[in-house]
Each structure stands twice: as structure tokens, then as C-alpha cells.
Curated annotation (Swiss-Prot):
Residues 1-68, 342-366, 432-455 are annotated as: Disordered. Disulfide bonds: none annotated. This is Rho GTPase-activating protein 3. Residues 24-33, 435-446 have a biased composition (Basic and acidic residues). Residues 105-118 form the CRIB domain. The record marks 190 as: Arginine finger. It is found in: Cell membrane. Keywords: Cell membrane, Developmental protein, GTPase activation, Membrane.
């Protein structure tokens, strides 16, 4: 705003000094003509009026009062100054004050680049100054002050058992849920926790600390809250039409491939968590449908409540199919592992492990009554075998075994026959004894017949 001041000669700064003179008689006609023109132009626009009253107008139009023309000029100047001040105040009220104020702010001076700090998803803050390390942990759970409501791309991540890149805070909560017995808690992920406890645990999780002795239902509720408070849902990339047309396992597999890498890894981790809960259904009463039902509303975000409810039902069926597929993959993997172990194991070791209890009856397995019964039968068979060999010794005339050697040494054939592998079972020995008796009787009958024939 330009400031005006009076000089000693009643002039203005920036304008030449003006000395009014009395007009002559020949100029009165011009004065009257100017007054007529003023009256005609007064009804046009206010701009003409302002222009006519500016300090730059001719002195002839304002010299009608003679000696008072100098005072009129000062009044006009003051009016112009007030008019400009009003215009500037109106412009500042319309928001132009920001533009004017920005011109008064200069560029920063004496700036020094101390350090360059970046956040890595796997290593946390990199390049952190040493004076800030006590306040900010180098492996912070998130680049933000909170782990909730933050994108997974700006959080510290780790790898799970399946090789998925998952936020570390989720893996810590999962581990603590398992160690606290959450898989066997009835109604896990379905029972809502206490709000007071949840807020306290939230503050600790924002610092990257999972407290011990936490309520498993509170921890399960925070896992669902993490998915619910994401900026974008895990399944928001998929349209409702795509999820609705997903009816078979093949359709679900093709639909998972369409997800971005970050969302796909988080979904696979979540499906594994749900499958672990379903495996303990006999304790927690949560089957595949129940777990999918409580997780479905947290996987998508929609503004319309009715549309969100309909879409949640479709997402529930999608999650249920993925859970059943995960359980089937686990069963197939376990069966394959058992088959490979059986193929790679030594046959002799396997035979010894299977017959260790039978071959050593003096060390029966007291925890298994079946093996105890087998050991008892083995001892009975051993007694029968001893009686059988005593019968053989008494029947030396039949030539079955030669036990009357002069030096008392046992031959190699006899030593081989006494090996446990070649000892007969009870039923076989009975059959052998009966066949031997029948053969002896048959030979005696043939010998009597032959003796009765007339030679």
C-alpha cells in the first residue's frame, strides 16, 4: 500500500506542486460545461465517478471555489487512499492474503543434510543416527507409529514356514496365540474380547511387543482387526462377479493367481492359520465354515452395507474352499512323507523294529497288552519246542537226529536247526508230529501185509 504525506508546500510526494489561480471570465463557460458533463456521466458507472475524482484529474474541473481547491485536492487524495485500503482488505478476505504473505517468506538458509534414513521391509530403519537409536528401534514393526491401519508394504516383514513374506507383527501374534493354547480355546476368533484389554494390547503391539499371558480371544480379535483396518482389503482387487463365479477348486486357484504378490502372501498365511484352527475342531468347535464366516467381513471393504453383506457370503464360500484345499494338501504331504520314509529305510532295520518285541520276550512292552500276550505265547511255544526235542531224542531208532555221538559235539545241521528262525510254530509242530505218527503206522501196516504174503 502506498503511503501519502503532505509536504511543506501543500503538495504530495510523487506529484508536482500545484498552485491554484483564479480563473478568468472567459473560463466560466468551460466550468459550466464541465458541470453538465459531470451530471450526465454520474448515472453511468461508479468507475467513471472514481476516475473523475482521482488526484490525476485536471485542475480546471476542481478550481471553481478558488482558494479552496487545494483543500479539495487533499480530500480527494485521502478518499483514494481509503478506497485502495478497502480493496486490499477485501482481497485478503477472499484468500489472496496467502499469496501476499508467501511473498514475504524467504528460502531456508544454513541447511545441512545430516543423514539419510530409509525404511526396509525386512531390516527396518537404515541409516538411523546414533542419537535416535534409543528412541526408535532399528527393527521397528512399521514405518508409522501404529501397526494398524497401515499398508503391509510399509511394515517390517519376515518369512513364514511356507515362504510367504508376511508382516512380522502377524507372525509374532500367531506364535503367541499357539503358545497360549489358543487353538484349543472354544470359539476362538468368534468370541469378542474386552475393549479395555484390546486397547492396552494395541499400544504394546505398536511398539512391537506381544505381551505374555494375554487373553487368546483378545489376540484373535486383534488379528481380525489388523485385516479390517487395512487401507485396502486383501481381496479388494477381485471384483464381486469374479468371486461369485468361483465354484470349484480350480476356479479358486486361478483367482488367487490374480492377486498382487503382497496380498497373495498374506492370504496364504491367513488360510494356513484358519486350517490350523480347523484341525483342532474337536476342542474349539470351529469348522471350516465357521472360521471362514468370521474372517470374510474383514477381507473386503465396501461402503454399502447391503452390498458388503452379500459379498461377504460369497467371500465366505471362497475362503471355505481354500481352507479345505489346504487341509487336503497337508494330508497328501504327510502320506507322501511316510511313503518316502518307508522306501528309504533299511529292510533289516524295519524287520528288527517290527519283531523286536516278539524276538525278545523277556522285555515285553507293559504299555501294550497286545505285545504282552504275544510274549506269553512265545514262552509257551518255547516250552513246547523243548518237549518236542526231548521226544526226538527218545526216538533215536527212527534216524531223525543223531544225538549219541562219541565226543558229545553237536553237528552243524543240528546247530542250524536250533536257530530261532528255523523253529516251527505250535500248529506246525502238531501237524509234524501227527504226520510222523501216521507215517509210522502206515509203515507198520505195510510191513504186516508184506509178511503175510506167500513168497
Amino acid at each position: 500500500m502506498t503511503n501519502f504525506s503532505r509536504s511543506k508546500s501543500t503538495g504530495t510526494i510523487g506529484f508536482p506542486e500545484f498552485k491554484p489561480t483564479r480563473p478568468g471570465p472567459d473560463k466560466y463557460e468551460n466550468i459550466h460545461n464541465d458541470d453538465d458533463e459531470y451530471e450526465e456521466g454520474h448515472s453511468t458507472t461508479s468507475t467513471d465517478y472514481y476516475d473523475a475524482s482521482t488526484p490525476l484529474s485536471s485542475h480546471a474541473s476542481r478550481s471553481g471555489n478558488g482558494s479552496g481547491s487545494g483543500q479539495l485536492t487533499v480530500v480527494d487524495l485521502l478518499a483514494a487512499v481509503l478506497r485502495k485500503s478497502l480493496v486490499m482488505s477485501c482481497a485478503m478476505e477472499r484468500g489472496e492474503d496467502d499469496v501476499v504473505a508467501s511473498m514475504d517468506i524467504g528460502w531456508p538458509t544454513e541447511v545441512k543434510h545430516v543423514s539419510h534414513v530409509t525404511f526396509d521391509r525386512f531390516n527396518g530403519f537404515l541409516g538411523l543416527p546414533s542419537e535416535l537409536e534409543p528412541e526408535v528401534p532399528p527393527r521397528a514393526p512399521s514405518a508409522s507409529v501404529s501397526v494398524f491401519g497401515v499398508s503391509a508394504k510399509s511394515m517390517q516383514c519376515s518369512y513364514d514356514d511356507r515362504g510367504n513374506s508376511v508382516p512380522t507383527i502377524l507372525l509374532r501374534m500367531q506364535k503367541r496365540l499357539y503358545t497360549e493354547g489358543g487353538l484349543k480355546a472354544e470359539g476362538i476368533f468368534r468370541i469378542n474380547p474386552d475393549n479395555g484389554k484390546e486397547e492396552h494390547v494395541r499400544r504394546q503391539l505398536n511398539c512391537g511387543v506381544v505381551p505374555r499371558g494375554i487373553d487368546v480371544h483378545c489376540l484373535a480379535g486383534l488379528i481380525k482387526a489388523w485385516f479390517r483396518e487395512l487401507p485396502t482389503g486383501v481381496l479388494d482387487v477381485l471384483t464381486p462377479e469374479q468371486v461369485m463365479r468361483c465354484n470349484t477348486e480350480e476356479d479358486c486357484s486361478r483367482l488367487v493367481i490374480l492377486l498382487p504378490p503382497v496380498e497373495s502372501a498374506i492370504l496364504d498365511w491367513a488360510i494356513g492359520l484358519m486350517a490350523d484352527v480347523v484341525e483342532h475342531e474337536q476342542f474349539n468347535k470351529m469348522n471350516a465354515r465357521n472360521v471362514a464366516m468370521v474372517f470374510a467381513p474383514n477381507m473386503t471393504q465396501m461402503a454399502d452395507p447391503l452390498t458388503a453383506l452379500i459379498h461377504a457370503v460369497q467371500v465366505m464360500n471362497f475362503l471355505k474352499t481354500l481352507i479345505l484345499m489346504n487341509l487336503k494338501e497337508r494330508e497328501n504331504a504327510d502320506a507322501k512323507a511316510r511313503w518316502l520314509k518307508k522306501q528309504t529305510s533299511d529292510p533289516s532295520e524295519e524287520w528288527e523294529s517290527q519283531h523286536s518285541e516278539i524276538l525278545s520276550p523277556e522285555k515285553p512292552n507293559n504299555n501294550n497288552p497286545k505285545f504282552l500276550r504275544v510274549a506269553t505265547l512265545c514262552r509257551l511255544e518255547a516250552d513246547n519246542e523243548e518237549e518236542f526235542w526231548n521226544i526226538k531224542k527218545r526216538n533215536d531208532h527212527e534216524g531223525v537226529l543223531d544225538t549219541s555221538s562219541g565226543n558229545g559235539n553237536i553237528g552243524p545241521v543240528q546247530r542250524l536247526c536250533k536257530h530261532p528262525l528255523f523253529q516251527l510254530s505250535k500248529s506246525t509242530k502238531k501237524a509234524f508230529v501227527s504226520n510222523r505218527d501216521e507215517g509210522r503206522k502206515g509203515r507198520e501196516a505195510w510191513s504186516s501185509r508184506l509178511s503175510s504174503l506167500p513168497w
